[in-house]
């Protein structure tokens, strides 16, 4: 499945539901779909729209879904310049606990089984395994 999502934060929910509704039964448990997948994908899309594409309506976020026998892999790529994930501040550090932002990737990493980034830093790959 491939999907181009307009850079409009109002479209995130519809895009997440479209992806979740197209997963074959039994690919992931209902709980993993209803919470882990939906939450992680919504966060990744929101970051791509807000930070990658700067909410520019002329840009889109590309979503590609790969289905395996026991996994779902979701690629999310924006049109932005990318960023170095190693330079993100640790959201659990005492100096960062009261920040209003900066927890998105931390949350994603705890919801999915594997997270990978493309070399440019404008694409994220989320892998959820059955079980």
Predicted regions and their residues:
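Conserved short strand/loop->alpha-helix "switch" segment adjacent to the catalytic nucleotide/phosphoryl-transfer site
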Residues: 20-42, 97-99
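Conserved polar catalytic motif of the HATPase_c/GHKL fold
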Residues: 43, 47
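Helix-loop-beta hinge of the Bergerat
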Residues: 1-31
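Conserved beta-strand-loop-beta-strand hairpin that lines the nucleotide-binding pocket
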Residues: 1-2, 49-131
């Amino acid at each position: 499945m491939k999907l181009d999502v307009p850079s409009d934060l109002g479209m995130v929910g519809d895009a997440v539901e479209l992806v979740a509704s197209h997963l074959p039964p039994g690919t992931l448990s209902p709980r993993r779909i209803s919470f882990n997948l939906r939450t992680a994908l919504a966060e990744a899309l929101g970051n791509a729209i807000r930070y990658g594409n700067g909410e520019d309506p002329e840009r889109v976020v590309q979503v590609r879904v790969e289905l395996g026998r026991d996994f779902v892999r979701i690629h999310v790529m924006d049109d932005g310049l990318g960023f170095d994930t190693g330079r993100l501040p640790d959201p659990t550090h005492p100096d960062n606990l009261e920040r209003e932002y900066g927890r998105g990737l931390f949350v994603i990493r705890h919801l999915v089984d594997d997270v990978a980034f493309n070399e440019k830093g404008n694409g994220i790959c989320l892998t959820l395994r059955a079980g």
